[in-house]
Amino acid sequence: MPKYNVSDFKSKFDKELTNHFNKNGYKQSFVFEDIRLLIAIACIIPAGLAFGIEYVYGFGVLKSYLKYLLPLYFLASCLLTFWSSVVKGSTVYVATKKERHIKISADTFLPLKNKPLITTKFTVLKNRNAVQLEWSVPVAHIFEEDGQISSATFEAEISKYLSQIEN
């Protein structure tokens, strides 16, 4: 794997993490993505209206509507940015299993040093009680030289840690 390609590193790790939980009987929830989609549609509506008004009636008529459409677009765009960066943040996976809710926030840290660690923060909700757990694993243990995740090693590492979440 290229030494400085943190985004490839993070996306491969997040995908493997999601696949692991899906294989182990967790039912994934897409609430964050659904809400983000609705907010994105709310951004498109004022822009589409502006385009339609200009196309049909011309820019002269559009000017009187812009004072309403631009603030709507701006607010929807700000809400989308807030939702994506603050509310959803780095959450990779939200799922339930046997009345347990698990929210996985994966903050990947890849410092430029010889032995970087990947750290994943888990929030497990059960009976309205939240438990914070953190899992760190050396990158060299789960990634091979060519940049692919060693599935067997990844499964072994996370299975050791998963017993804490399951109990």
From Swiss-Prot:
Disulfide bonds: none annotated. Residues 1-36, 90-167 are cytoplasmic. Residues 58-68 are lumenal. GO terms for cellular component: endoplasmic reticulum; signal peptidase complex. Pfam families: SPC25 (PF06703). One of its GO terms (biological process) is protein targeting to ER. It is found in: Endoplasmic reticulum membrane. Keywords: Endoplasmic reticulum, Membrane, Transmembrane, Transmembrane helix. It comes from the Eukaryota. It is a multi-pass membrane protein. The chain crosses the membrane at residues 37-57, 69-89. InterPro entries: Spc2/SPCS2. Component of the signal peptidase complex (SPC) which catalyzes the cleavage of N-terminal signal sequences from nascent proteins as they are translocated into the lumen of the endoplasmic reticulum. Enhances the enzymatic activity of SPC and facilitates the interactions between different components of the translocation site. Belongs to the SPCS2 family. Component of the signal peptidase complex (SPC) composed of a catalytic subunit sec11 and three accessory subunits spc1, spc2 and spc3. The complex induces a local thinning of the ER membrane which is used to measure the length of the signal peptide (SP) h-region of protein substrates. This ensures the selectivity of the complex towards h-regions shorter than 18-20 amino acids. SPC associates with the translocon complex. This is Signal peptidase complex subunit 2. The gene is spc2.
